[in-house]
A protein has these predicted regions:
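Conserved N-terminal alpha-helix of the aminotransferase class I/II PLP-enzyme fold
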Residues: 41-90, 115-122
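Conserved small-domain helix->loop->beta segment predominantly found in fold-type I
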Residues: 272-341, 357-363
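N-terminal "arm"/small-domain region of PLP-dependent enzymes with the aminotransferase-like
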Residues: 2-63, 71
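PLP-dependent enzyme catalytic core of the Aspartate aminotransferase-like
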Residues: 1, 121, 130, 148, ...
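Short, well-ordered beta-strand elements within core beta-sheets of diverse protein domains
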Residues: 253-262, 310-317, 373-377
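Conserved PLP-enzyme active-site core in the AAT-like
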Residues: 2-5, 14-20, 81-283, 288
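Active-site beta-loop-alpha junctions enriched in small/polar residues
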Residues: 158, 187-189, 292, 317, ...
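Short loop segments at secondary-structure junctions
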Residues: 36-37, 225-229, 257, 316-321
Length: 395
């Protein structure tokens, strides 16, 4: 971005922040597809490795293309620092592992992506870290679950796939009063619709695989927070364990950021149109969309989000059998477990993202056998609605 004292708006930062041009002055950011770097002297090599002078030493540690992506994400999020990872789950796992050690305790909302819940319930205990899962809406449960060893609060909001929205500022206050840090998975909101750091969160994580790429091409993740948090808790983990984002994927994600605002705007319009079209449909028993006034957390949404969502969820009659009949009748919309794509996609959480949970656990989270998660793409809303309504006739 040009040197200036101006504060640019998010749409401008998405296009210009972090740009590092080579001596050739290319208009499109360069892809530095290299493992290592040549040093002008042995002394320079020693100084770079010791950290006495800045510079790249190995692309597992950092890379100019990765740096451009990280700087652009930090500018968009309003964070002091960002670090990229190979996947969203690498970002989540690193964000949690970097804040705990044996004997520590984590409090997390129950409504989590299946892999996130596995990390908390199955992986962290192998290293002596215990956890308590709570109803994220109930602030009293966050307080009650806190112990003297609690070091981390973790939530995703809006949640996957029920689109619950938690009060980030209120939970951050509880965490900080307990001496803990709050980590927020902000993937469903995107940096454009929700800013957890300004609401009191200490760390924000993303699966860049979703909206940031936006076209179903590559995997990636991001961890954002203060410079001190990143250096004290994550720098060495990322450097030594190697969950590194590839330079090629960083370049694809960097280019994806340029169109994020226009894509998310169109996707949100489509998701809202679909939600309104399905509301009250005789084959739909439940509809959840953060942009509608009937959302259970509508007040929280108005307080902390700038718009609704690119996703909506709805439950069809007939349980799993009804859901499968609906899914198999779709002609335009694809069945997959991804989201945030240019193409509209649907998922059956019971048999995919949340399959490992027991029926009772899914029921507790509001994930019925007939629940469908819809991720809006860039198609014309009328075509999407027509496909959905036609498929509902098969239920």
């Amino acid at each position: 971005m040009p040197a200036s004292t101006k504060t640019y708006r998010p749409e401008t930062r998405l296009v210009h922040s972090g740009t590092l041009r080579s001596q050739f002055g290319e208009t499109s950011e360069a892809l530095f597809l290299t493992q290592g770097y040549i040093y002008p002297s042995a002394e320079d090599c020693e100084a770079r490795f010791s950290g006495k002078i800045p510079g790249y030493v190995y692309s597992r540690y950092s890379n100019p293309t990765m740096s451009m992506f990280e700087q652009r994400m930090a500018a968009l999020e309003g964070a002091e620092a960002a670090r990229s990872t190979a996947t969203g789950m690498a970002a989540v796992t690193t964000a949690l592992m970097g804040l705990v050690r044996a004997g520590d305790h984590v409090v997390a909302a129950k409504a989590l992506f299946g892999s996130c819940r596995w990390v908390i319930e199955e992986w962290l205990p192998r290293f002596g870290v215990t956890s308590t899962l709570v109803n994220g809406i109930d602030l009293a449960q966050w307080k009650k679950a806190t112990t003297r060893n609690t070091k981390v609060f973790f939530m995703e909001t809006p949640t996957n796939p029920t689109l619950e929205v938690y009060d980030i500022a209120a939970v951050a206050d509880i965490a900080h009063n307990a001496g803990a840090k709050l980590v927020v998975d902000n993937v469903f909101a995107t940096p454009l619709y929700q800013s957890p750091l300004t609401l009191g969160a200490d760390c924000v994580v993303y699966s860049a695989t979703k909206h940031i790429d936006g076209q179903g091409r590559v995997l990636g993740g991001v961890i954002l927070g203060s410079e001190k948090l990143i250096l004290d808790h994550y720098h060495q983990i990322l450097r030594q364990t190697g969950p590194s984002l590839s330079p090629f994927n960083a370049w694809v994600l960097l280019k994806g950021l340029e169109t994020l605002s226009v894509r998310v705007q169109r996707q949100t319009e489509n998701a809202g149109a679909v939600a309104n079209a399905l509301a009250g449909h005789k084959k739909v028993t439940r509809l959840i969309y953060p942009g509608r006034p009937d959302h259970p957390q509508a007040e929280t949404i108005r307080k902390q989000m700038r718009a609704g969502s690119t996703l909506c969820s709805f439950e069809v009659k007939g349980g799993k059998e009804g859901a499968f009949r609906f899914l198999n009748a779709l002609e335009l919309i694809g069945i997959t477990n991804n989201l945030g794509d240019a193409k509209s996609l649907v998922t059956h959480p019971t048999t995919t993202t949340h399959q490992r949970l027991t029926p009772d656990q899914r029921a507790e989270l509001g994930i019925g056998d007939g629940l469908i998660r819809f991720s809006a793409g860039l198609e014309h809303a009328d075509d999407l609605i027509a496909d959905l309504l036609t498929a509902l006739e098969k239920v």
